[in-house]
Amino acid sequence: MKGLRSAFSFFTIIPIKSELDEHLIAYVPLVALFDAALAASLYVAIYGISKLLASFISVSAIYIVNGLNHVDAVADAGDAMMIRNRSRIREVFEDHDVGAGGVFTLIFVYLLALISLSSMDLYIGIFSIILAEFLSKSMMMITLHRSRPLFQGIGSLFIDLYRKHDSLYTVEFVVIPIVLALLSRASIMISVALAFLIFIIVKMAVIRRFGGINGDLAGFIGELGRSIFLMISLIMAQSSVLSTYDILSKIMSSL
């Protein structure tokens, strides 16, 4: 229970007093479940009024319940990507001011998620919200897998915690989104696979660019992963990919 309390205390704004427990990473999927349930509920409740408003409230709720920590991470990563001199990267991450790169990156990531979700029908939207949250948390955590700390801080602490059960954590964060995807349409299953592929490419590019990983970069990759998945999910849904139910129905009717 200490790990669960620690996970909710660290990753959400829920007022739970808890010290940083070494097992909190194992409970991150439960945080994702809470976030996804909240966002999906708001989405369903408001969808009949306005798809755009439902999407805005849903996406914003996740950012807010996470304490806007990842908003800061996306902005810092955006600013850092604009710096050519590696010796100044730490200075940029520790600077509280947000530059043009940070503003653009934050707007891009947020609007990509918002526009993609607001263009979906209700069924696809619900599944996409849920899977996007699990994928976001999974990608953020898997970013720590065999990564070198960029410098000492929260990121290096989490990398050390992840290394203690590296293989188990990686299996956990890969399997959960895949299992959830199998319960949905074929288009969403393909979207999850493509999102993971793009995640691997992005992680490699980030490590090549910065030489390591810190908390902000892990948070940025998680949020970018959410937006990319929602975009892919929309594209796949509109490309008339048959659902698993449709495929089974056609097979049964042909017998």
From Swiss-Prot:
Pathway: Cofactor biosynthesis; adenosylcobalamin biosynthesis; adenosylcobalamin from cob(II)yrinate a,c-diamide: step 7/7. InterPro entries: CobS (IPR003805). GO terms for cellular component: plasma membrane. Its cofactor is Mg(2+). The keyword Magnesium applies. GO terms for biological process: cobalamin biosynthetic process. It is a multi-pass membrane protein. The chain crosses the membrane at residues 24-44, 45-65, 98-118, 122-142, 164-184, 187-207. It holds the Pfam family CobS. Keywords: Cell membrane, Cobalamin biosynthesis, Magnesium, Membrane, Transferase, Transmembrane, Transmembrane helix. Its EC number is 2.7.8.26. It comes from the Archaea. The keyword Transferase applies. It is an enzyme of class 2 (transferase). GO terms for molecular function: adenosylcobinamide-GDP ribazoletransferase activity; cobalamin 5'-phosphate synthase activity. It is found in: Cell membrane. It catalyses: alpha-ribazole + adenosylcob(III)inamide-GDP = adenosylcob(III)alamin + GMP + H(+); alpha-ribazole 5'-phosphate + adenosylcob(III)inamide-GDP = adenosylcob(III)alamin 5'-phosphate + GMP + H(+). HAMAP family: CobS (MF_00719). NCBIfam families: cobS. PANTHER family: ADENOSYLCOBINAMIDE-GDP RIBAZOLETRANSFERASE (PTHR34148:SF1). Joins adenosylcobinamide-GDP and alpha-ribazole to generate adenosylcobalamin (Ado-cobalamin). Also synthesizes adenosylcobalamin 5'-phosphate from adenosylcobinamide-GDP and alpha-ribazole 5'-phosphate. Belongs to the CobS family. This is Adenosylcobinamide-GDP ribazoletransferase.
